[in-house]
């Protein structure tokens, strides 16, 4: 029982940290003893989160461009590009989530 409480408390802390660190998400939450309720629409939260992640990846790429080339830097740039591609695939895989049924 105590483990479940710790997991819940950790989750609430993460959500509050995200709300503080990323005000552009405009997270609206309600916290009670048992759960966290997101008051934003899932679609809105999804789109804002994707935009935020893409922006962060762009900032990482721009920062990496400030350093001289090295094998470590090339690996970081490669991984950043892979993250962006993986995010795009995630977006495409969830496209049906936002499509109207025909």
From Swiss-Prot:
Known outcome of mutating residue 5 to R: In plasmid pCHL1
Keywords attached to this entry: Plasmid
Top-level taxon of origin: Bacteria
Note: PGP4-D is required for growth within mammalian cells.
This protein's name: Virulence plasmid protein pGP4-D
Species: Chlamydia trachomatis
